[in-house]
């Protein structure tokens, strides 16, 4: 699994808590609120789809009410997931339900666990990656939260305001609340053994057990659907017209030439009396296009993800880099619409290999070949390119991201 170099990879188990009855949301023929339809799909399906497509997720366990097996089966019947999804029955309280999910994961060999409310469908991979980075850097517990912005009042039993509470250092907790797996399992087991059943979230159990909890920035949209009006607003949000967010990213790269037997450009090997010098396979075209894709979502550059100082990338095929960038784009809601590469070289001739290069780009990016362009020009014997000392590439990627009217 590829990770940013600043963090250790995690193997995450996901506990989705879906055993509640949701009485405040009112009764419905669709069942509890996690099975209500928003944007044409049940709430719980939106939640699961976000986790299913997250690279670090290794096992998902959904904790459901014993009476909801048919509801869950109906809701999930169209789900196709490479990440295993299983269900277990929950208990009388959220705390008991979470413990049931944790016990299921005990023999699944996960390093960490993310515990999430099924009725919080509006989180994204940016938040998950933020949490994973803290966990990978050694935090035993990570809580996404938003600073409290409303003015807080304290009232007496008669409903009269008695004080204004300072908002300083106050946060509204969200999920997924995330932990080193064995640590939070042990804390939950100890809480159950001691008869404590009044914890309202998992971070509270961690605090009680003496586990330090690190706060990371949550997302404003990551709200819990509690009332009937929440579900109606969520449906409106997902059903609103989709507006395109078209972004263009540019990338540039250059590699020196040295004596050799050929160069690799756009994943195609071209016999030549020189080769490109570099830490990886030095595919200057794919390196430029990787940067262009990352630029469309502010995800840094190729050196951030694959530093040349890291020996694991020595001689690596640049296919790894471009497919990684394309995956990041898709995880962040992007659709790659076009990829254009311009090669600047005196030799070798690109024309005879252009269609093979376009086919490789189509394969790596998962888009139609008509959306892939490869062009070449000389530098009119000017500069380092003109002296056949190197090859340069300029790439442009067009990606459509989507956002919704509120």
UniProtKB/Swiss-Prot annotation:
The record marks 167, 224 as: Positions MEP for the nucleophilic attack. Its EC number is 2.7.7.60, 4.6.1.12. Residues 247-406 are annotated as: 2-C-methyl-D-erythritol 2,4-cyclodiphosphate synthase. This is Bifunctional enzyme IspD/IspF. Signal peptide: none annotated. A divalent metal cation binds at residues 253, 255, 287. Its cofactor is a divalent metal cation. GO terms for molecular function: 2-C-methyl-D-erythritol 2,4-cyclodiphosphate synthase activity; 2-C-methyl-D-erythritol 4-phosphate cytidylyltransferase activity; metal ion binding. The record marks 24, 33, 279, 378 as: Transition state stabilizer. It catalyses: 2-C-methyl-D-erythritol 4-phosphate + CTP + H(+) = 4-CDP-2-C-methyl-D-erythritol + diphosphate; 4-CDP-2-C-methyl-D-erythritol 2-phosphate = 2-C-methyl-D-erythritol 2,4-cyclic diphosphate + CMP. Keywords: Isoprene biosynthesis, Lyase, Metal-binding, Multifunctional enzyme, Nucleotidyltransferase, Transferase. In the N-terminal section; belongs to the IspD/TarI cytidylyltransferase family. IspD subfamily. In the C-terminal section; belongs to the IspF family. One of its GO terms (biological process) is terpenoid biosynthetic process. 4-CDP-2-C-methyl-D-erythritol 2-phosphate binds at residues 253-255, 279-280, 301-303, 377-380, 384, 387. It comes from Rhizobium etli (strain ATCC 51251 / DSM 11541 / JCM 21823 / NBRC 15573 / CFN 42). Pathway: Isoprenoid biosynthesis; isopentenyl diphosphate biosynthesis via DXP pathway; isopentenyl diphosphate from 1-deoxy-D-xylulose 5-phosphate: step 2/6; Isoprenoid biosynthesis; isopentenyl diphosphate biosynthesis via DXP pathway; isopentenyl diphosphate from 1-deoxy-D-xylulose 5-phosphate: step 4/6. Bifunctional enzyme that catalyzes the formation of 4-diphosphocytidyl-2-C-methyl-D-erythritol from CTP and 2-C-methyl-D-erythritol 4-phosphate (MEP) (IspD), and catalyzes the conversion of 4-diphosphocytidyl-2-C-methyl-D-erythritol 2-phosphate (CDP-ME2P) to 2-C-methyl-D-erythritol 2,4-cyclodiphosphate (ME-CPP) with a corresponding release of cytidine 5-monophosphate (CMP) (IspF). Residues 1-246 are annotated as: 2-C-methyl-D-erythritol 4-phosphate cytidylyltransferase. The lineage of its organism: Bacteria, Pseudomonadati, Pseudomonadota, Alphaproteobacteria, Hyphomicrobiales.
């Amino acid at each position: 699994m590829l990770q940013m170099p600043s963090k250790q990879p995690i193997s995450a188990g996901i506990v989705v808590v879906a055993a509640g009855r949701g009485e405040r949301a009112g009764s419905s023929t669709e069942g509890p609120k996690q099975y209500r339809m928003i944007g044409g799909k049940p709430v719980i399906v939106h939640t699961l789809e976000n986790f299913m497509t997250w690279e670090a997720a290794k096992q998902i366990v959904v904790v459901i009410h014993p009476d909801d097996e048919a509801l869950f089966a109906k809701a999930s019947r169209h789900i196709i997931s490479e990440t295993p999804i299983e269900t277990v029955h929950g208990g009388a309280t959220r705390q008991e339900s979470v413990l049931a999910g944790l016990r299921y994961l005990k023999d699944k060999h996960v390093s960490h666990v993310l515990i999430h409310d099924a009725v919080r469908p509006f989180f994204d991979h940016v938040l998950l990656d933020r949490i994973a980075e803290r966990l990978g850097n050694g935090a035993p517990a990570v809580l996404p939260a938003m600073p409290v912005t409303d003015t807080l009042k304290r009232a007496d039993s008669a409903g009269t305001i008695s004080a204004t509470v300072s908002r300083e250092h106050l946060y509204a907790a969200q999920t997924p609340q995330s932990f080193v797996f064995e640590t939070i399992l042990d804390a939950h087991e100890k809480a159950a053994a001691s008869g404590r059943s009044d914890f309202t979230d998992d971070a509270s159990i961690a605090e009680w057990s003496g586990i330090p909890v690190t706060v990371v920035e949550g997302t404003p949209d990551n709200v819990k659907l509690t009332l009937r009006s929440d579900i109606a607003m969520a449906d409106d949000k997902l059903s609103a017209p989709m507006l395109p967010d078209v972004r263009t990213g540019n990338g540039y790269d250059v590699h020196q030439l040295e004596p050799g037997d050929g160069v690799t450009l756009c994943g195609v090997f071209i016999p030549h009396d020189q080769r490109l010098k570099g830490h990886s396979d030095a595919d200057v075209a794919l390196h430029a296009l990787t940067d262009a894709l990352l630029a469309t979502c502010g995800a840094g550059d190729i050196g951030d993800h694959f530093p040349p100082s890291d020996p694991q990338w020595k001689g690596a095929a640049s296919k790894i880099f471009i497919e990684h960038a394309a995956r990041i784009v898709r995880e962040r809601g992007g659709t790659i619409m076009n990829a254009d590469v311009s090669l600047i070289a005196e030799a070798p001739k690109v024309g005879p290999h252009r269609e093979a290069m376009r086919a490789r780009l189509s394969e790596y990016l998962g888009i139609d070949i008509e959306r892939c362009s490869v062009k070449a020009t000389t530098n009119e014997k000017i500069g380092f390119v003109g002296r056949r000392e190197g090859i340069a590439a300029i790439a442009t990627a067009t990606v459509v991201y989507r956002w919704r009217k509120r």
